[in-house]
UniProtKB/Swiss-Prot annotation:
This is Pregnancy-specific glycoprotein 22. PROSITE patterns: IG_LIKE (PS50835). Glycans are attached at N103, N110, N231. Keywords: Angiogenesis, Disulfide bond, Glycoprotein, Immunoglobulin domain, Pregnancy, Secreted, Signal. It comes from Mus musculus. May have an angiogenic function during early placental development. Binds to cell-surface heparan sulfate proteoglycans (HSPGs), and stimulates secretion of the proangiogenic factors VEGFA and TGFB from uterine dendritic cells and natural killer cells. Also induces endothelial tube formation in vitro. One of its GO terms (molecular function) is syndecan binding. One of its GO terms (biological process) is positive regulation of transforming growth factor beta production. Residues 44-140, 162-260, 280-380 form the Ig-like V-type domain. It holds the Pfam family Ig_3. Residues 387-471 form the Ig-like C2-type domain. InterPro entries: CEA_cell_adhesion (IPR050831), Ig-like_dom (IPR007110), Ig-like_dom_sf (IPR036179), Ig-like_fold (IPR013783), Ig_sub (IPR003599), Ig_sub2 (IPR003598), Ig_V-set (IPR013106).
Amino acid sequence: MEVSSELLSNGWTSWQRVLLTASLLTCWLLPITAGVTIESVPPKLVEGENVLLRVDNLPENLRVFVWYRGVTDMSLGIALYSLDYSTSVTGPKHSGRETLYRNGSLWIQNVTREDTGYYTLQTISKNGKVVSNTSIFLQVNSSLFICGRPSPPALLTIESVPASVAEGGSVLLLVHSLPDNLQSLLWYKGLTVFNKVEIARHRTVKNSSEMGPAYSGREIVYSNGSLLLQNVTWEDTGFYTLQIVNRYWKMELAHIYLQVDTSLSSCCDDFNSVQLRINPVPPHAAEGERVLLQVHNLPEDVQTFLWYKGVYSTQSFKITEYSIVTESLINGYAHSGREILFINGSLLLQDVTEKDSGFYTLVTIDSNVKVETAHVQVNVNKLVTQPVMRVTDSTVRIQGSVVFTCFSDNTGVSIRWLFNNQNLQLTERMTLSPSKCQLRIHTVRKEDAGEYQCEAFNPVSSKTSLPVRLTVMNE
């Protein structure tokens, strides 16, 4: 932006001279606070987007206003605007992406992480006095940002696929939220971590796997952490533990309880067919719903059954205990008042919350004082709220680029993208951020024109954003 000849003739030939003149005219050390306000539009930013630092309540009778980086250092000037001459002068911190408007607002295009920081607007009156100094902090988040708000580290979880497997079948223990800085991962049979029960380990740096003492020859460990169990038997029922180690030697554990459904088995072994088993109905529940922990194959001569919250059958975790002989019910420390116990051993959880997620344990005792134990995992999620989608520019030229960003107020959700009400088919010109909340089209083509939406979902619900139409223009 060039300075007018009239302005130049008055001696405003450089940014440094402008700042010197302003500093001589103003009482810099004692600025007057006025009612000027600055708002970031939009308030949340991801790399590649544009932002308007919108100014309101600009004082009257101003001569100039100045934008600069930081709070007090005027040598970090971005641009100065002379209201007398309706002309702006760029400063040393002007990157070529900033546009200064007569109303004081500053437009910054294609922001990067380096644009994060304080921005200050100084206004100067016609008599050369500082009227106001107003600052705003601009936060630019990278593509690793969970769009909408910084997300706590995702919890390492394991899912059984399928949820129930018959003897002779295969099951995948699918790992979710594996960290990027992974060094190694180890699988164990049971809840404890020691060498004797190690199934296998995988080193990501070498992309190599080693089998442990508990390896049966039927397991395959994958680089994404998942474990495939083939030709399962009822003896494979039980807990499995995944241990991960990152490059900073920080360890994390996750557990899953595998149930082998012997009732689906083609064999006719009566012993296998009476194995105690629990199914959560439904497998995934929304907050406020009910979950029935449905018991199968309860021993015929059972005398007592006990329910516990967690995997350990100790008094502090006891929910309830029922004696069939005396028809007596005793609630434990972990009883919340929302549980209903049925005479077939099943337990109903009412008005569940996310805190009810986790393992539950059933212990049965028969007339011969034989004890059987079974475990079940409960999964409770919040209902998803509607996400909001933004685009850097809804009208782009062919060969240009555009960034769509999906903002969700929910944590633990997944994101998928829709194009003209269909699942978006990614091309080599498109990239997704690691969390999939940001979609970038690098070289736009005519066929990219249309309506884009993002969908936020978890196992119990999903919501789709309002559509944003992209218009593609010829060069």
